[in-house]
Amino acid sequence: MRTESTRTRPIIPEIVAHRGYASRFPENTLRAVRAAFEAGATHIEVDVLLSADGVPVLMHDATLARTAGRPGEVAALTWNDLARVEVAERSRLGEAGAGETVPSLSQLVRLLEAHPDTNAFIEIKRAALTRFGVEVVISRVLHELEPVQERAIVISFSGDAVRQARAHGARRIGWVLERYDDDALSEASRMAPEFLFCNYTKFPPSPQRPWVGPWDWVAYEVTDAAVALDLAARGVRFMETMAVAELMSALGAQRQ
């Protein structure tokens, strides 16, 4: 007689590639996004700033120092200038990222169109909001995202930005929490975003579940499978990670 296993199968979370497959390739580049898709990720997250002439580009930092190894502000350069800036992150990756340049949001949209089963979280950075104003940034970003609007989710630390995105027709929005406290819960309840992002270290200790609401949770930066499984068991649907293939492989082993 065959004995059925009584071991409960773990809940396997979904993966969000944080700035693409950024542990192996330069963050926020088309190469990093392609690599994430090739590794099997169906959700990616990228950061957006505006160039001097108002073109949305994929960049996390307001300056070029860390990723490009040169002085200068993103908002001080036109798109034509930024398109020639190499963002190889040589101090972190050596020559592995050689030749990668700053991509525009429109270039990412074309890549998403070539991968119709994927979704993208588009994080609008506060530096852009401060420099250009919320209305301008939201308008420019949503315009670029129109071809993939059903699969693109505008997110930000700025509650005002995501509220404006909703008001201007964004299908789905996500709020990135700075704090996990009662004030943030009240704001999230009023905003009712489809997604809440949070640094997983800010969650209450296990086995407590994070707030329940009309949102799905996205926890970042998760690289450990045990942490991911614990969070998933507590109701967190997505794990955001730069170590895309590594975490997916470790979680895949749990399905055996």
PLM ranges: what are they?
Residues 1-256:
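Phosphate-group recognition and catalysis centered on beta-loop-alpha active-site segments
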